[in-house]
A protein has these predicted regions:
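Preference for protein termini
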Residues: 1-472
Length: 472
C-alpha cells in the first residue's frame, strides 16, 4: 500500500496553506485546554442525544458517534474541483436511472451488461416506463470521496438510496462554533447551516404537476427503532415538516393523506427513509408494517413524489459502480472529473482469477453490502479469514467486487497520546431539484480512529469531524 497523503503537512514537513492558521492555533493552545474542550464536546453530544443504533449489539443498542474536534480543512480551489465532479456524477446517475427504466439505450449500446440490471435484486420492474416528476430520481445523494494525493479525489461509493449522516454534519458545525469561536475568527469558513432550507426547496420543487398551493412535504421514517431515527427526527424538525410513520398515512383515490388532529391532509412529497422493500405491502414485501398500503398506486398515478425515487438502489450497486466512468461518458460525452477506484468484477472469470491470487492485498466487498459489513481487508485479515472469503468468492463470485487497498489521506486527530494522523473520507451531500443542483460547501468527514485502520464507518468504530471549506 502506498504512503498516505497527509492533508496538513506536505513533502519534507512543509505545512499546507489551508492548515497554516490551525497549526498556529494548535501551537498556542495548551494540550489540557484542547482536551477540556474535547470533553465539553462529548458532553454536549450526550446532552443533545446524538446516537446511532448498532444492530445485533447486545451490549449497547445506542452509541454516541465519537467526534474529533480537529477540523478537516479544504481550500476553495480543492472544493471547486470536488463540486464540479459531484455535479457531473449525480447528473449522470439521474440520466442512467431514467434510461434503464425507459429506453435502455445504454444496455443496447453494450456499455452495461443487461444481466447486471435485470438479474439485480435492487432493480425494480415496477418502475419500468414510469415517469417521475422532472426526471429526478436521486434527489439526495451522499457520494463517498477519498483522497489519495494533492490532486486526486476518488469516488468510493455512490449512495443513491437513502444516504444518511447529514445531521452529524450540521451538529458538528454547531458544536464547533460553540466551543471554538476563537478558531472560527481566524478562518473564513463557508457555512453549511443553509442545508435544511436548500433541501426543503429542492423537495418542494419536485412536487407533482398540478399542485397549486405550497406543496406539503413529510418525512417517512421506519420508526424509533431504526438506527438513523435521530437523524429523521432532527431533519423533520429543521425542515419544519411532519415526521410520519407508515401508519400515519393513508391512500384514498390514488392520493396520499396524513392523519392530523384536524383531519386528513394531502401530502405531495415524501422524503422517505424507508427502503423500497418496505414501502408498500401491496407491491413489495407483504409482511411490511413500515410502509403505506397503496402508496405505489398513488406513485404510478403521478400524485406523489418519493425522494429518492423507487428503484434508485441499482445506481449505488457496487457492481454498477465499476461502470460509472463509462456511464458518465455515455450520457454526457465527458471524461469523469472524479475517478473511480480500480475495481475487479468477480463475476468475470479473468478478474476472479486475479482476485483469488491476490486476496491478501485487496479489499473485497459485497455488491449489496453497506456500513463496512461483509467485506475483507486483505492486508489486515488473518489467513483463516482470507481462506473463508476465498470459499465465498468461489461459491458466489457475482456477489463481490474487489479493489486495491487505498492509502486514504490522513488528518490530524486527537488521540490518547496527543495529535496523530488518522485516515479519513468525505461524504458531501448533493441535492437535485427541478431546476438546480445544490451542494453545501463541506460534508461529513468520517475518521478511522484506530491507528492504522482504514474503516471509517461509525458502525465499525469510526468517528466524525467538522469539514471546513475556506472562503477565499
Amino acid at each position: 500500500m502506498a504512503v498516505a497523503f497527509d492533508e496538513m503537512n506536505g513533502p519534507e514537513g512543509h505545512l499546507r496553506t489551508a492548515y497554516s492558521e490551525l497549526s498556529r492555533w494548535l501551537k498556542e493552545t495548551p494540550p489540557e485546554a484542547l482536551d477540556y474542550r474535547r470533553q465539553e464536546a462529548e458532553l454536549l453530544f450526550r446532552r443533545i442525544g446524538i446516537t446511532f443504533a448498532v444492530y445485533g449489539d447486545a451490549e449497547a443498542q445506542e452509541r454516541l458517534i465519537p467526534f474529533d474536534v480537529i477540523p478537516r480543512i479544504l481550500s476553495a480551489k480543492e472544493w471547486g474541483i470536488l463540486e464540479k465532479g459531484l455535479r457531473q456524477r449525480v447528473r449522470a446517475l439521474n440520466m442512467f436511472l431514467r434510461d434503464i427504466y425507459h429506453g435502455r439505450d445504454i444496455l443496447r449500446a453494450g456499455v452495461v451488461p443487461e444481466g447486471l440490471i435485470f438479474q439485480n435484486p435492487v432493480f425494480r420492474p415496477e418502475m419500468n416506463g414510469q415517469d417521475v416528476p422532472h426526471d429526478v430520481y436521486v434527489h439526495i445523494a451522499g457520494i463517498d470521496i477519498v483522497r489519495v494525493d494533492a490532486d486526486d479525489f476518488i469516488v468510493l461509493e455512490d449512495n443513491a438510496r437513502t444516504p444518511s449522516g447529514v445531521s452529524y454534519m450540521l451538529e458538528n458545525r454547531e458544536i464547533m462554533m460553540r466551543l471554538f469561536p476563537d478558531l472560527f475568527a481566524r478562518h473564513r469558513v463557508a457555512p453549511v447551516e443553509r442545508y435544511p432550507d436548500e433541501l426543503l426547496a429542492a423537495l418542494r420543487s419536485v412536487a407533482p404537476g398540478g399542485v397549486s398551493a405550497e406543496p406539503t412535504v413529510a418525512l417517512l421514517t421506519p420508526g424509533v427503532y431504526n438506527s438513523a431515527y435521530y437523524e429523521h427526527s432532527f431533519l423533520a424538525d429543521k425542515l419544519g415538516i411532519e415526521l410520519v410513520e407508515g401508519r400515519d398515512l393513508i391512500v384514498k383515490n390514488e392520493e396520499v393523506f396524513m392523519r392530523t388532529t384536524e383531519g386528513l391532509k394531502r401530502v405531495d412529497v415524501i422524503y422517505r427513509r424507508v427502503d423500497d422493500d418496505f414501502l408498500d405491502p401491496l407491491t413489495f414485501r407483504p409482511d411490511s408494517v413500515l410502509g403505506v398500503p397503496g402508496l405505489m398506486s398513488a406513485y404510478a398515478a403521478g400524485n406523489i413524489t418519493l425522494a429518492n425515487a423507487v428503484g434508485t438502489g441499482i445506481a449505488d450497486d457496487k457492481a454498477i459502480y465499476s461502470y460509472m466512468p463509462d456511464v458518465v461518458k455515455f450520457y454526457l460525452g465527458e471524461d469523469p472529473i472524479l475517478k473511480n477506484v480500480q475495481t475487479w468484477r468477480c463475476r468475470e472469470p479473468k478478474d476472479l482469477s486475479y482476485v483469488l491470487d491476490n486476496l491478501s492485498d485487496l479489499v473485497v466487498k459485497e455488491v449489496h453490502g453497506s456500513g463496512g459489513y461483509g467485506m475483507l481487508i486483505g492486508p489486515a485479515a488473518t489467513k483463516a479469514t482470507i481462506e473463508a472469503f476465498r470459499d465465498k468468492l468461489k461459491r458466489e463470485p457475482e456477489g463481490f467486487i474487489a479493489q486495491p487497498t487505498l492509502a486514504l489521506s490522513t488528518c490530524p486527530t486527537c488521540t490518547a497520546s496527543g495529535l496523530a494522523p488518522r485516515h479519513v473520507d468525505l461524504r458531501p451531500f448533493v441535492l437535485t431539484g427541478s431546476k438546480h443542483t445544490t451542494i453545501v460547501p463541506g460534508g461529513l468527514t468520517r475518521v478511522a480512529l484506530r491507528e492504522g485502520s482504514l474503516v471509517v464507518n461509525s458502525s465499525q468504530g469510526g468517528g466524525t469531524k467538522d469539514t471546513w471549506i475556506l472562503d477565499e
